[in-house]
Amino acid sequence: EKSDKFDQLLLLIESGIKSIEQMNTIKTINKQLHDKNEELERAYLDTIGILRQTVEAKDPYTRGHSDRVSEYSVLIGKKLGLDEKTLHILKIGGLFHDIGKIGIPDSILLKESKLSDEEYSQIKNHPMIGVHMLGDAAIFTDILPIVKHHHERYDGRGYPSQLVGDDIPYVARIAAVADTFDAMTSKRSYRDSLPIDVVRAEIERCSGTQFDPNIAKVFLDIMDNDFDLIREIQEKYK
């Protein structure tokens, strides 16, 4: 009987050792898969990043735009107390929000005079072009709301979906403020950058119509009390 119990104990020990070995093997495989996935994600991000830079390289007046929008969005997100995952979405979403412009003809994208209605309609296609470009890649799922909806307006008069108020994804509402601020404070082929007091007044005026009023309020507070943070971003991505 003692011998039987001893044999059973040995079997249990052997079984336990095998289980541990199997668990270690599974952990190793999972780590290898995780590392490979990270490599693929980095490669994909690098590829799309090159496309993004290609878009900005076409127009010297918008160079650095996406980098600044990314950092302004994160700055707003931090002031709002958002979690790290959402801040990461804002960062990557800001970088790729205009990726769809790669599908817009240079003759329209670089035009120095006023756009015709037809040309403006084509420009308005860039969010959906971006969604089609990134939509099949799982790593971009979280940023698609920014790519698609950063031109929506709080009052429902934006594009492409004419969403109203809280129906607009929160991260897209943040990116909209960041995007507009950078557009107004950047020199363009058809105008100089706007004075900062004019920009501030415009954001305040559009609070509740173009912008989520709470997000606009937070950004106005940054402009009033932490403008050095904005200036650092502008200096970094001249």
Positions of the model-derived regions?
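N-terminal membrane insertion elements
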Residues: 1-27
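Low-complexity, flexible helical/coil segments
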Residues: 11, 33-34, 211-214
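Heptad-repeat alpha-helical coiled-coil signal-transmission segments
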Residues: 19-22, 26-33, 40, 47
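Metal-dependent catalytic cores of enzymes that make or break cyclic nucleotides
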Residues: 38, 45, 49-238
